[in-house]
């Protein structure tokens, strides 16, 4: 299963800077620190953790517990992802509008793809518009007809092979798993 891989969490002075499955993110962060940071960090760690530990961590982490490296625009997009919470999925175009950049859907999508802390910053909850349209169609059909025993739960919708939830840095299957976890978990 996609969740069985070794996950690496990079921390700088105790703050989460990246989550990945390879040490490339650590190298990227080291290059960024070397070229742009005036103050040297006291401690940089890269620790392997399990998927379950990441899921537990994301329930307790606060925005100030993270240290993000990116452009001002990228940080704005990542903050908006964080603020949107984990209770809904949005299309890229709807999310770009939420970011007050409706005309810049591609730029917003690119920033989403560069999210250094996926899973915790829920970039997986932004999906192609076609997926949203199909989900709405299923929900409308269910409301306008007699319920015929079809399971319209989140799990059933996520398992519908006709719905493409889009690309994800760790694969499509894990994206669906994360959507399922987030949408079926009660939020505080």
State each model region's role:
Residues 1-102, 148-162, 169-188:
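Basic nucleic-acid-binding alpha-helical/helix-turn surface characteristic of O6-alkylguanine DNA
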Residues 15-16, 116, 125:
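Structural motif
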Residues 94, 109, 125:
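Residue-level "edge-of-site" marker
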Residues 103-121:
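Regulatory, non-catalytic segments
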Residues 121-167:
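Charged low-complexity interaction tracts in eukaryotic proteins
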């Amino acid at each position: 299963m996609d969740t069985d891989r070794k996950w690496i969490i990079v921390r700088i002075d105790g703050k989460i800077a990246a989550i990945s499955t390879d040490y490339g993110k650590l190298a990227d962060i080291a290059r960024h620190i070397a070229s742009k940071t005036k103050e040297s960090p006291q401690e940089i760690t890269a620790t392997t953790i399990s998927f379950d530990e990441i899921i537990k961590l994301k329930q307790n982490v606060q925005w100030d517990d993270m240290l993000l490296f990116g452009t001002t625009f990228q940080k704005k997009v990542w903050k908006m992802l964080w603020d949107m919470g984990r209770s809904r999925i949005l299309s890229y175009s709807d999310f770009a509008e939420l970011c007050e950049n409706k005309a810049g859907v591609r730029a917003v999508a690119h920033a989403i793809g560069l999210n250094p802390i996926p899973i915790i910053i829920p970039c997986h909850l932004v999906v192609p518009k076609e997926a949203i349209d199909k989900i709405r169609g299923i929900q409308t059909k269910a409301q306008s007809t007699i319920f015929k025993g079809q399971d319209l739960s989140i799990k059933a919708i996520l398992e519908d092979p006709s719905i493409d939830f889009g690309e994800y840095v760790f694969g499509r299957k894990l994206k669906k798993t994360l959507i399922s976890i987030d949408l079926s978990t009660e939020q505080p």
